[in-house]
Amino acid sequence: MRNLIILFLIFIIPSKALGLIEVDITRGNLNPLPIAVSPLSIDDESKKSFEKTLKKKDIGSEISKVIEKNLKTSGLFNPLDKNAFLQAPDIAHLKPRFEDWNLIKAQALITGKVKNVDDKLRVEFRLWDVLAGKEMMALAFTTVPNNWRRVGHIITDKVYERLTGEKGYFDTRIIYVAEEGPKTKRIKKLAIMDQDGANNKFLTLGNEL
């Protein structure tokens, strides 16, 4: 996990000890778990800094979109419409009003915040059990700003594992052979991309295959 540091783990309590929510992936006809992915809050100074370096207007929202997309494509989770959220992201991260999240039928909630610390990207996130009104997990990461998508994948892995008991697969990369050029003179190149198709890069020039 080069250039990526897990700063701290506040706590992870086994769900069976508290009777918290779990996703049973062994059952057939599984109904996706309703989960609210709150946009990661960010202070104005950090927002301007990352907008300049990453060309992203709101990097906190971009990271939350990665998490939301990952959870949705897994088929096990149903990310809820953000327009229905009743609590501001920064307030929800500190102390969720669980009655508000219950009102929109969320069973789990992800909150977080982003900050520029010495030109590094620091991301904190928390996973909450809405039904039990308890925090299930809290983690923080510090990395170079360009790793923002990977942070989203790692957070999804942690959430997926916590709720299903299975290892996540979102922070993985795929190596494949890409072809281009006319049919009579195809060029094959070795390429790599994230599991969601982002960050596609060629590893060879086409002369090696």
Task: List each model region and its residues.
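N-terminal signal peptide c-region/cleavage motif recognized by signal peptidases
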Residues: 12-16
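Residue position within the beta-strands of beta-propeller blades
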Residues: 111, 174-179
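Amphipathic beta-strand/beta-sheet edge segments enriched in Tyr/Trp
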Residues: 21-22, 92-158
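Short beta-strand->alpha-helix linker/helix-N-cap micro-motif
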Residues: 24-97, 110-114
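Multi-bladed beta-propeller domains
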Residues: 193-209
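Positively charged n-region of N-terminal signal peptides that target proteins for export
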Residues: 1-4
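Structural motif
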Residues: 118-123, 182-191
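Conserved beta-propeller blade repeats
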Residues: 148, 162, 207-209
